[in-house]
């Protein structure tokens, strides 16, 4: 197993501490919260005064979650809300968390746009080293360097919108990806392109 798993909380804390941080609130990932629990994001309103809404992924989920987030921002009432209650519990999935704790341990990890984050990833515990591909084959995956002019880090941090990035639709498109952010149809880059089907932007 080549373990490149990431940890959400350290990355969010690093994002908030970045000098160009300009985010008013967070839609928190429902698939992460399904394991860790909605309470894993409680630190956002309590420590940073930032609204946080755990959301699912259907259009209805997203519209409702965004409406709650906007309401919290407008009323200056930061709180943690969970609109994905059909999947996410406050405490998450105890059995899955116990398995993760048994097999994985936090480690320093590199995040695109945020750099190296202490505790930002997971490593396989020594007890399971026989299954760790990096140890078995004696290599350490190095993060790929961003190509010149790559805007992935800026967009991931919320410091720039993909629609205004000069490479979008030119050097950075589904058929000619200019960085990891354009490697999938999800997130801000996918929305900026219009789904990534190659037919142009939304």
Give short role names for the model-derived ranges:
Residues 16-25, 43-47, 144, 157-158, ...:
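Solvent-exposed alpha-helices and their adjacent loops that cap or buttress functional pockets
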Residues 2, 20-89:
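A conserved active-site cap/scaffold subdomain adjacent to cofactor or substrate pockets
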Residues 140-195:
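Cysteine-cluster motifs in flexible loop/terminal segments that predominantly coordinate metals
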Residues 12-13, 38-45, 60-71, 97-101, ...:
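Predominant activation on well-ordered alpha-helical scaffold segments within soluble catalytic domains
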Residues 196-202:
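Compositionally biased, low-complexity flexible segments
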Residues 4-7, 29-32, 56-57, 152-155, ...:
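Fold-independent oxyanion-binding glycine-rich loops
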Residues 4-17:
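Short, flexible loop segments at boundaries between secondary-structure elements
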Residues 64-154:
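Internal helical hairpin/lid segments
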